[in-house]
């Protein structure tokens, strides 16, 4: 069967559409579960209303959406079954959908109990058979009921609709035989007419519409609210325009309609009035979101909210287990009641979650069928995430009234069963732990101890290169392990797929952020400078090749940075670049007069001729400025030695304090906070920063062995001394160490 050609048929009378509506669905499912209820007046209760009832109860005056008290007054022998748990109805709906797929893949679900089917391809297939080609009377009822034959239309749709009635009859019989459920069916050439004509005769019956009587059928509907696609608000607007029936809408002045509704809406309403509908039957796949909401009396206590979320989460996980996919996002829905304004409004927050919170196992006895379950301890972690989202919506310092709570899982992904996924072989934990660069912008430096992430904080991490942005200390950074480092936009807060705790108001997956034009230009400039930097420097630029303590600290603001080239900079007020690369400066170490000094390649060549040229060195290191104040020559940049720092006199201590007070701090360090630190701590910080630069330069220029020997023969290196003790830098600035 050529189903692709069916989608292109939007002309009049070319398609054959079947609409199936299950009879009193919730109540019928309960009758199937308990056959003794078939002869009794049965109502399905949700909260304080009867959401639906069987035909025995309807015969006694009970209607849908009637209050429980009123229904029991009208029908004292009414049997009520709690229908708040939708799991049995959801399972039956899926079984119905699976059965319909045996006839055509073009099946569109409309709630639990309704389905559209485009059987055009199946009808064409049966038309090829001689027995079916003969014009046989349709099965079931026909509109109009005066005996008008389907052949009243000469476009050839009569035979197609007649075959469609036989297909609908076969489907209804199979549903009754295999699932024990009955339904009504409507057959027409479009979705709108098929749905409306199917309700003409119920329960457990079917009706076909003669195509040429579509306008008359719509006119006889009378009330506008019976037309699918016209809601309560639209009906009120039509009443204001003087139209209360379908017939009046058919005869309306289109100029008046366009002024009131606009061209598109006015045209759509006019088409609905005449039964015109070109919408296609869109095959339903697995849902993008699985959610659940619970309306309640006003809640104003946090513990009550947490308990209701716990119940919702437990029921929601059961639905995920049936679905078989793993969600990577969870959304909280709240309806807050304003007692002063006497109004309610909804608010939502969403957060990404780790797939590792779920585990997949094979169902026993069923080949190829997997079941998704929560991992050990995952429910408590998810509940903590939910409550954090709740506290982002509700100000806990003020009174609140919650009248509805909801949870939803989204961003589903298929998960392979077992541990043989290729990702398990390509990812190493050691590599992942170093591929992050911490920003120190807008941080609080008052805590002297590092905090280790708790288990629930780990659940927020969607990737090892991200941190929890709910705490301003963390800023998202990402790098690659390629020789050319990724440009980091210090002002970007996008990339929701990499965030650990991202807030959204919608459930759609956000697209990946595009690279800016300046980013592409800087990447091009970086590639042209590869010859200057050399292959070894490129390797050092990879975060996976460096220790975390060797990575310099970045800031989100515009600050001085290492230059990207060896060209000397003579400008003292050049703006700092917005984008940064994790790239050490192109410098070399020279041993002059028995001490280590920082000089650039170009400065080294001019050192003998111009001793003051170091002042224009392309390495604007803040440490250079601080050391230059106490050094005997402007061309020397001696490294501080721990041994000389430990033994100081009162006069030298005063000089050191003055020098440290005027130091220009490196990128990412607050100068005011630095000045408040003890003198020995300031000295240690400077030594640690310089040792990191030394290590980077040694690896860049291939002089690691020679420099190490030189350091060993002279004063002991600070990095070596600090290796035996905890680096104070990370005690004050890093919380994820």
UniProtKB/Swiss-Prot annotation:
InterPro entries: DNA/RNA_pol_sf (IPR043502), DNA_pol_Y-fam_lit_finger_sf (IPR036775), DNA_pol_Y-fam_little_finger (IPR017961), Rev_trsase/Diguanyl_cyclase (IPR043128), UmuC (IPR001126). Mg(2+) binds at residues 21, 113. Transmembrane segments: none annotated. Keywords: DNA damage, DNA repair, DNA replication, DNA synthesis, DNA-binding, DNA-directed DNA polymerase, Magnesium, Manganese, Metal-binding, Nucleotidyltransferase, Nucleus, Schiff base, Transferase. Its cofactor is Mg(2+); Mn(2+). Residues 563-577, 607-618, 632-643 have a biased composition (Low complexity). Residues 443-464, 482-515, 557-581, 607-643 are annotated as: Disordered. It comes from the Eukaryota. Residues 491-502 have a biased composition (Polar residues). Its EC number is 2.7.7.7. Residues 17-231 form the UmuC domain. The active site is at 114. One of its GO terms (biological process) is translesion synthesis. A 2'-deoxyribonucleoside 5'-triphosphate binds at residues 26, 58. Residues 212-277, 288-413 are annotated as: DNA-binding. PROSITE patterns: UMUC. One of its GO terms (molecular function) is DNA-directed DNA polymerase activity. It is found in: Nucleus. A motif (Ubiquitin-binding (UBM)) lies at residues 669-686. It holds the Pfam family IMS_C. It catalyses: DNA(n) + a 2'-deoxyribonucleoside 5'-triphosphate = DNA(n+1) + diphosphate. The catalytic core consists of fingers, palm and thumb subdomains, but the fingers and thumb subdomains are much smaller than in high-fidelity polymerases; residues from five sequence motifs of the Y-family cluster around an active site cleft that can accommodate DNA and nucleotide substrates with relaxed geometric constraints, with consequently higher rates of misincorporation and low processivity. Error-prone DNA polymerase specifically involved in DNA repair. Plays an important role in translesion synthesis, where the normal high-fidelity DNA polymerases cannot proceed and DNA synthesis stalls. Favors Hoogsteen base-pairing in the active site. Inserts the correct base with higher fidelity opposite an adenosine template. Exhibits low fidelity and efficiency opposite a thymidine template, where it will preferentially insert guanosine. Forms a Schiff base with 5'-deoxyribose phosphate at abasic sites, but may not have lyase activity. PANTHER family: DNA POLYMERASE IOTA (PTHR46404:SF1). Belongs to the DNA polymerase type-Y family. This is DNA polymerase iota. It comes from Drosophila melanogaster. The gene is PolI.
